[in-house]
Structure formats: structure tokens, C-alpha cells
Amino acid sequence: MTATFLILGACSREAPKTAPSAEQPAASSASGAKAADGSWAAFASGFIEARMKADPYFAVGAGRHEFDGQMPDWSRAALDADAATLQAALASIGEFDSATLNPGDRLERDYLKWVIETQLFWQTKAEQPYRNPAWYLDRLDPSMYLTREYAPLPKRLEGFLGYARAVPGITAHIRANLRTPLPKAFIERGAAGFGGYASFFKDEMPPIFAQLQDAKLKRELTEATAAAARSMAELTAWLESQRATATDDFALGAPMFREMLRATELVDVPLEELETIGRKDLERNLGALREACAVFAPKAALAACVGKMRADKPVGGTVEGARTQLADLRKFVQDKKIVSIPNQEQALVAESPPYNRGNFAYISIPGPYESPAVKVTYYVAPPDAKWTAAERNAYIPGKGHLLYVSAHEVWPGHYLQSQFTNANPSRVSALWWDYSFGEGWAHYAEEMMYDEGLGAGEPEMRVGMLTNALLRDVRFLSAICLHSGCMTLEESEKMFREQAFADAGNARQQALRGTYDPGYLAYTLGKLMIRKLRADWMAANPNATLQQFHDKFLSYGAPPVPLVRREMIGSTAGAL
């Protein structure tokens, strides 16, 4: 999940039982001006329609298939015009006085204000379209055309054709927008990402459309994907050519990092205090790991204990192991009354498609306008068949690790959260998710489920949960320190190896991610804010149950946690 205002990224959205019409309503306030009738509902509806037109890729991901095949204009002039439109919308939002709004509209107003301010921060203050190739990468993923069966494959590939034809123009805009010299870490990320797209278009798309009977469509796809592959390869080569002048200047700097937290998470805490909070949580989890390892692997070093957990593989392989875990996790959530389950839909489990195996596991949740017939799929990547037997075995996670990945992604993590957001009458809450809310909830769910008895009596399961937590703690500290100057990239990499027990390759990847995704502190940041809110709310409501807290927390959509805190206890103060 990227650090932009959160939208349909790595954790996409599920369709509600009754999706809004895919037909475009009579648009009002499409330019960001206050609605003619002065109502908040009309303004919010008009804003959503304006965003769909400005970013048709976002619209397609949300399930608005009248936009299939269209892509946004990323020329500098278009980006500047879009920023001006967002500024105008922000000014219009300021005209809606709290005294004239009901509580639901007031929350939605502040929610939408945050959406706009977050996008403006990344686009105009942090200047990500001009500094960071990663800004573009997640906005180019065509998986919705390939894996979401909202229409027969030929129809979906017609949409993919329009997308592919747009790619050469997009890569030209990306090259024109990026200012040189670029940071080394950004070049590495960009070259890997755009190079991956080049390989995808060249090698992995032809087998997908080979089954088509329509010779004309097949020919057009062949031509378009070849041109897309060339343009991505050329962009990759250009980025590689920038290595000679590359810099180490990836950091936002402490003032901008703090502004990032204020704008994108509504968190205003001195960075020194945040670092102290993060180190305290790291030490808490290391202490818990020592306790678990004293039982699971007595007298062994912590790294050896973690290695023992990783060596115990899921029965039947990763996909079958995950499928079994989902049934058990859902039953555990119900039996323990952890949180309500809004509907009876189930997530499918499948191997990740060959073109999308960069992450070990992810969940694809169709957007809120999508047909309910389009299923949610939890994807797990198998080891590469070209690897050695030892490499394949090492890649398969231990069952203790996989259990909490499944809890994070599905029950009661991202998938269950999506059921709540799509049951919410606010389309704003279904379309935009806050990074710290979404990833914070899913990460919070891992430890909460252990505390409620998941894996009880099995120290191996606790070791699995804690290794996930330690990785997120080191991300938290790396994000702060990489961007404020208290840690080098090499020191971050070392910390991932020594404190999160990552192997050398994963440690390098995790440290690099911190340079181009400074918001990846969101996992631990969100978890800590949710834990604090839970403690404060339960103290004020001593007769309340855990299920009541979770149901109430998830009922607000997925805005920044401080906004939920305001709704639940009356103040944003004391979020951490």
C-alpha cells in the first residue's frame, strides 16, 4: 500500500450488497464549487464524480466500468490544474459550518477535507510526482482487468487495451516530470518497478490473450502491449542512466516528515517523542519474544528460535494452509465474539498470478461500485519453480507466521474491515482508506487475536505473531529516522536484520522501502493509536464488551484514527 491518500491500493475494496448505480448521476460541484442547492450530500456526490473523471484509473478500481480503458493525464499542466481544483474544493468544504450539519455529515466533511489535504500534501508539498518514481507505480497496476471477473475476459481485455495504449504517453510524462538528479534508492525502486512492467507486457500478457477468438482484438492487444513494453523498457533504461549522477538525498527532512504526519494522519507529535514511543514498543515485543522462545526453544538464541518457527511449514503447502486457517479464523472471531461479521461472504484463496508475485501475500477486494458477484481473493505467492529446493523451502513461511498474515489480510483484518466500510452509507468512507487506519487495524488485529486466545498454548504461534510485530516496529523507527537524519540506510538495514530477524535480502528491501514510502510507519502508528483508544474508551465504558468496541470503531469507515477518537470519546487529544 502506498503512502498516498488511501484509495484502492494493495488493499482494494469489496462491493457492498447493494452497490450504487454505475450510471453517472447528474453531477453537481464537479469543479469543486459548493453545490447549487447548498447541501452537503450534493457537494460530496459531486466531488466523487469529479474525482472519477479526473482519475479514471481510480474509478475503474472502484468498480465504475464506464471508465474502463481510460487513464489519468499526468502531464505537468494537468497535475497543476488538478491541484487547483482540489484547492477550490477545499475552500468550498470550509463553507460548510458544523452548526448546519448533522453528526454524520460533519464527520464526512472532515473526512473529505482530510482526503484532499492528503493528496495535496503528496502532490504539491512533498512533490512526489516530480521526485519519486514510486508515486506512479501502484497507479499503473492493471490487475483489475485480469483477475476481477466483472465481465467475460474479452470484454475486460477491451478495457486493458485502452490502458495499454495509454502507457507510452504516460511513460513520457513520467520521464518529463521526474527531476534529476534522483536519489539512488528511488532509481533502484523505479528501475525495478518499471522494468517489471516491461517484462509483464512482453512475457506475461501474451499467454493471457492467446485464448481469445477475436483475431482483431488479439492483434490490437499484441501491438499495444509491445508498444507498452518498449516504453517501459525505455523509461527503465533512462532511470538506469541516471545512476552516474544519483544522490543520497531521499529524506523528506524532519519538518516535512512532521508535516506529513499532520496532513496525512492528523498526528501532531514531536518526532523525538514518536521515536521514544516506537522504541518502547520494540522493547516490549522483544521482551515478549524472549518469553515465548524460553518455552519454544529453550537456551537457543532469538534468531535460532525464529528460525525454528519458520522451519515448521503449513500442512499441504501455503495455499492449502491459508485456506484451512481462514475457516478456523472466522470461527474463532464468531465464537469469541471478537467483532460482528456483517455478511456471509467468504474470501477465496488462490496462488498469486505470475505477474504479481512481488509480495508474498495480498488481498484483492473489489471496489464499492463493483458487482457483488465479483469475489474477494486472498492471494499467496508460491516459491519460484526455478529456485533451488533449499530456496523454495526457505520461501514458504512457517505456519505461525502464516496464521497472523491470514489474520491481518482476512479475519478480522482487511477483509472484515471492508465489509464494515461498504455497509456504511457514506461513499466517502468506502472509497478512501487512511493508511494508519487500514494497516493499523490489520496489525492491531494480529496481537489482539493472540491475546484473545488464538494459538493459545502454542508458543510457536506467539513467536510468529511477534516476528510480524517486530518488523513493523523497525519500519516505524526507520521511517522516522531515515527522514529526519538519525539513521542511515545501512543502519536501517542492520536493524531489520538484528531486531526483526529479517534475512539479508528482505532487510535490504525493507530499508529501501522506507526511503520511498515514508508513511510505512503506519502499521505500528495505527496499532498504537487503536490500542490507546480502546483503553480510553473501555475505561469510560466499563460495562462494554470487546465486540462493542470493535463494532463501534469500524462503524465510522476508515478515516484517520484521531477522527474516530473524536467521535468515540469527544477529543483527538491523547491519541498516542
Regions from the PLM with identified roles:
Residues 8-10:
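C-terminal motif of bacterial Sec signal peptides marking the signal peptidase cleavage site
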Residues 13-576:
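N-terminal maturation segment of proteins
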Residues 1-2:
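Sec-dependent signal peptide recognition
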